[in-house]
């Protein structure tokens, strides 16, 4: 008998799970319910679409090592009817910068990253200036540069490629908004949509991203994941920054090339970061008061720049420890969660899709063990703190 898997959320996480399920076992019936089929409000499409191995937790590093392997071979993996999709992967590297106060942490993280196989180069202040002459290094002690395996790509293109391949393999996508679930004891038996349709499920996957908290509440589960707005600014400047990577300032402000322009952003301070702010608004004060002054300090040529375009998207922000929550909840026998990526969902999507597929089909992780990201740590108050949240 074929198994019915219903996935709520058709962004990069949900579509990756759908793809791996159908690629691994064509007898599994997969239905993906996506409330926003145009992806106009999708975090996958609105993000800065980048990948790195410069994390402070081993599992995040390993997930992104698989992520870059997947992205490099995406055209071959996700080919449909002779068409090989391209996501314009540019391995321009991340450059994390540290002041003397942050130098020890950066070096500790670098040792972990390279031990796990990441291609990260540790640089002192002189090396930073020699490699990036446009950079102000006066207040810096060191930097860590991703020589390969880190960079940026077309996030919307990745979602579309995964979706189209999943559909070609037999996954069904339904444009609908989930408004309820039917729970029978320790199982969810049906998902109910706004139009009154009921979808039976042997397994339910919560991949609803920034909307995972209300879906979890329908299931009777309190998940510490909230929708937190992040604004991105596309700026033009006469500055010509040779070999420009995705730069992370010690303040948390970031920028990277985007064609002939740049995109930039940062996370707001906790006291200015409430839940569920509207996506049709942009935090211009954050740009004027924090981002631009920081850019101009770090790259003096950025004194002259102009905002060309700006937009906002949501982080599905795990306030517990900024890491994803992946796996079954102990109170529900047939519900898998894949939520709370806190800005890392695009790059961790392939590893999540592979792992969740293994968990559903075989009852365990067969390749990379994602169990440390399970619900147990949340329920037992054992956070896995990620220090490198951008």
Language-model segments: residues:
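Glycine-rich FAD pyrophosphate-binding loop
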Residues: 22-44
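Central helical "cap/lid" subdomain
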Residues: 197-244
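Conserved beta-strand-loop-beta-strand element in the redox core of flavoprotein oxidoreductases
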Residues: 180-200, 204
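Beta1/beta-strand and adjacent pyrophosphate-binding region of the FAD-binding site
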Residues: 1-13, 31
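C-terminal catalytic lobe of FAD-dependent flavoproteins
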Residues: 293-390
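Dinucleotide-binding Rossmann-like beta1-alpha1 core, especially the glycine-rich loop
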Residues: 49-131, 252-254, 296
């Amino acid at each position: 008998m074929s198994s019915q898997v219903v996935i709520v959320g058709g962004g990069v996480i949900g579509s990756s799970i759908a793809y791996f399920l159908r690629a691994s076992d064509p007898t599994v019936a997969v239905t993906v319910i996506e409330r926003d089929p145009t992806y106009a409000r999708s975090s996958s499409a609105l993000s800065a679409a980048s990948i790195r191995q410069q994390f402070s937790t081993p599992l995040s590093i390993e997930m992104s090592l698989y992520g870059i392997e997947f992205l490099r071979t995406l055209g071959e993996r996700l080919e449909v009817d002779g068409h090989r999709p391209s996501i314009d992967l540019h391995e321009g590297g991340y450059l994390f910068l540290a002041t003397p106060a942050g130098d020890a942490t950066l070096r500790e993280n670098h040792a972990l990253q390279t031990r796990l196989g990441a291609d990260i180069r540790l640089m002192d202040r002189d090396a930073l200036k020699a490699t990036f002459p446009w950079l102000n290094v006066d207040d810096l002690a060191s930097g860590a540069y991703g020589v390969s395996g880190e960079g940026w790509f077309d996030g919307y293109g990745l979602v579309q490629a995964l979706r189209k391949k999943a559909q070609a393999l037999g996954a069904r996508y339904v444009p609908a908004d989930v408004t309820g679930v039917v729970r029978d004891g320790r199982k969810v038996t049906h998902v109910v949509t706004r139009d009154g349709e009921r979808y039976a499920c042997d397994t339910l996957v919560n991949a609803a991203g920034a909307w995972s908290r209300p879906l979890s509440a329908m299931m009777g589960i309190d998940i510490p994941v909230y929708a937190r707005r992040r604004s991105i600014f596309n700026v033009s400047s006469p500055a010509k920054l040779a070999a420009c990577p995705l730069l992370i300032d010690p303040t948390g402000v970031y920028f990277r090339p985007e064609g002939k322009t740049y995109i930039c952003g940062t996370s707001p301070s906790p006291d200015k970061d409430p839940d569920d702010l509207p996506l049709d608004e942009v935090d211009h004060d954050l740009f004027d008061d924090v981002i631009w002054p920081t850019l101009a300090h770090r790259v003096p040529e950025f004194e002259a720049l102009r905002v060309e375009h700006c937009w906002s998207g949501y982080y599905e922000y795990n306030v517990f420890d900024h890491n994803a929550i992946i796996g079954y909840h102990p109170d529900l026998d047939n519900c898998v969660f894949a939520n709370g990526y806190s800005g890392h969902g695009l790059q961790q999507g392939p590893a999540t899709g592979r792992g969740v597929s293994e968990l559903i089909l075989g009852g365990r992780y067969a390749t990379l063990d994602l169990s440390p990201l399970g619900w147990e740590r949340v329920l037992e108050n054992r956070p896995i703190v990620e220090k490198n949240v951008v």
